[in-house]
C-alpha cells in the first residue's frame, strides 16, 4: 500500500529549506511517525494550518524510501489558545516532547494519543500545572514506568511508610531501604497521596484537589525526575520552562 490515511497530532515541525517542513506525528494506529511536508509553509498551501504543532489533523501519506511524504492534510482541531499564550505554548510543547520521547515508532499508541489529546484540550483553558502532572504520571504508567506507591521499591514491604522516592528503583522506599539509592529524594505521605490520585482519578475529578505549594513542588520534582531518568536526558522544553520562570507545579 503506497498511500495511507491516518489521524495524528503534530508533535513537532522543523523547517527544511524555505517552505518545507519535517513533522513528528503521533497517531493512534501507527504510533510515532516522521514525515516530510513539501511546501507546507507557503502562505497559499492548503496544508499550512494542518501541520502546525499541537494540531490534530487527518493526513494522506505516501510511503517514501527514507521518509513518508504528506500528500494531503486537513486540520480537525487547531488549539489556537495554545499558540496565543506563551505559558500555554510552553506547557503544550513540554507534553508533546514527552509524548515524542515515550511513544514507539510505527507501533499503535492509542493510550498515549488519547492522553495527549485530553491534556492539550485542558491546557487550552487551564495552566495550573495539574494537567501537566496528570500527563507525566499517566505516560509513565502507560509505558510501564508508573511509580510504585503501595509497597517499598527496595524490599517489597507492605504497607509502606515512605521515607524517600527513587526514580531509579521505581517508587517509594521505606526507612530501612532509604539508603539503597543515594540520589533518592525525601518523600512525604502527602506527596504519595497526590501521586496516587494522579494515577487513579480522571482528569476532570482532579479539579477538586487542593494541593499546597510545597507539596505541589515535591510532586513536580519527583515526576520530572522519573521522566528524566527514563528518557535518559532532561527534556529541552523542561529546561525552557525553568529558564522562562514558567511554573509547571
Curated annotation (Swiss-Prot):
One Pfam family for this entry, by name? RecO_N
Q: Which GO terms describe its biological process?
A: DNA recombination; double-strand break repair
GO cellular component terms listed in the entry, alphabetical order: bacterial nucleoid
Q: InterPro entries, alphabetically? A: ARFGAP/RecO (IPR037278), DNA_rep/recomb_RecO_N (IPR022572), NA-bd_OB-fold (IPR012340), RecO (IPR003717), RecO_C (IPR042242)
Q: Does the keyword Hydrolase apply?
A: no
Keywords tagged on the record: DNA damage, DNA recombination, DNA repair
Q: Is ATP-binding set as a keyword in this record?
A: no
- Function per UniProt: Involved in DNA repair and RecF pathway recombination.
Question: Which NCBIfam families does the protein's record reference?
Answer: reco
**Membership in a protein family:** Belongs to the RecO family.
- What is the protein name stated in its UniProt record? DNA repair protein RecO
Amino acid at each position: 500500500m503506497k498511500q495511507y490515511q491516518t489521524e495524528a497530532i503534530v508533535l513537532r515541525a522543523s523547517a527544511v529549506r524555505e517552505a518545507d517542513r519535517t513533522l513528528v506525528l503521533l497517531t493512534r494506529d501507527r504510533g510515532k511517525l516522521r514525515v516530510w511536508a513539501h511546501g507546507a509553509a507557503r502562505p497559499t498551501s492548503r496544508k499550512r494550518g494542518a501541520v502546525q504543532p499541537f494540531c490534530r489533523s487527518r493526513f494522506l501519506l505516501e510511503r517514501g524510501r527514507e521518509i513518508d511524504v504528506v500528500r494531503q492534510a486537513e486540520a480537525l482541531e487547531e488549539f489556537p489558545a495554545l499558540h496565543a499564550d506563551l505559558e500555554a505554548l510552553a506547557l503544550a510543547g513540554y507534553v508533546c516532547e514527552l509524548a515524542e520521547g515515550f511513544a514507539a515508532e510505527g507501533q499503535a499508541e492509542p493510550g498515549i494519543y488519547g492522553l495527549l489529546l485530553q491534556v492539550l484540550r485542558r491546557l487550552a483553558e487551564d495552566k495550573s500545572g495539574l494537567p501537566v502532572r496528570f500527563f507525566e504520571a499517566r505516560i509513565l504508567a502507560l509505558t510501564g514506568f508508573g511509580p510504585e506507591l503501595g509497597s517499598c521499591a527496595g524490599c517489597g514491604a507492605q504497607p509502606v511508610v515512605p521515607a524517600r522516592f527513587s526514580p531509579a528503583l521505581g517508587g517509594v522506599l521505606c526507612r530501612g531501604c532509604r539508603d539503597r539509592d543515594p540520589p533518592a529524594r525525601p518523600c512525604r505521605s502527602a506527596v504519595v497521596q497526590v501521586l496516587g490520585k494522579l494515577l487513579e482519578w480522571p482528569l476532570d475529578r482532579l479539579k477538586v484537589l487542593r494541593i499546597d505549594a510545597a507539596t505541589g513542588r515535591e510532586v513536580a520534582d519527583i515526576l520530572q525526575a522519573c521522566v528524566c531518568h527514563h528518557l535518559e536526558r532532561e527534556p529541552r522544553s523542561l529546561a525552557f520552562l525553568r529558564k522562562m520562570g514558567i511554573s509547571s507545579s
